UniProtKB/Swiss-Prot annotation:
Keywords: ATP synthesis, Cell membrane, Hydrogen ion transport, Ion transport, Membrane, Transport. Has multiple subunits with at least A(3), B(3), C, D, E, F, H, I and proteolipid K(x). It holds the Pfam family ATP-synt_F. It is found in: Cell membrane. This is A-type ATP synthase subunit F. Belongs to the V-ATPase F subunit family. It comes from Methanosarcina acetivorans (strain ATCC 35395 / DSM 2834 / JCM 12185 / C2A). It is a peripheral membrane protein.
Length: 101
């Protein structure tokens, strides 16, 4: 399983420098939608990292798909986006058990 990152240039640069190969740089909402759809269809991606603000800008149906996605598991970083979940909540949703208990 691979890690993918979707975001604006300043968000994805660090991931790119860290060696992440599947980096999708976006400039607007249509490019964001296209990148998210591409990642959701790619079965080799296990984790998707996005900024909360970019997720909040997506259409409702696409946000719902991301929130319900088990593979890839979506990790939202930064901001205080609507419906943001902690990493703990995401792992609990994906695995079905709270591993911190």
């Amino acid at each position: 399983m691979e890690l993918a990152v979707i975001g604006k240039s300043e968000f994805v640069t660090g991931f790119r420098l860290a060696g992440i190969r599947k980096v999708y740089e976006i400039v607007d909402v249509p490019s964001s939608e296209s990148a998210v759809k591409s990642v959701l269809e790619d079965k080799s991606i296990g984790i998707l990292v996005m900024h909360n603000d970019d997720i909040s800008n997506l259409p409702e149906i696409l946000r719902r798909n991301l929130n319900e996605s088990v593979q890839p598991t979506v990790v939202a970083l930064g901001g205080t986006g609507e419906g943001s979940m902690s990493l703990r909540d995401k792992i609990k949703q994906a695995v079905g058990v709270d591993l911190w208990k």
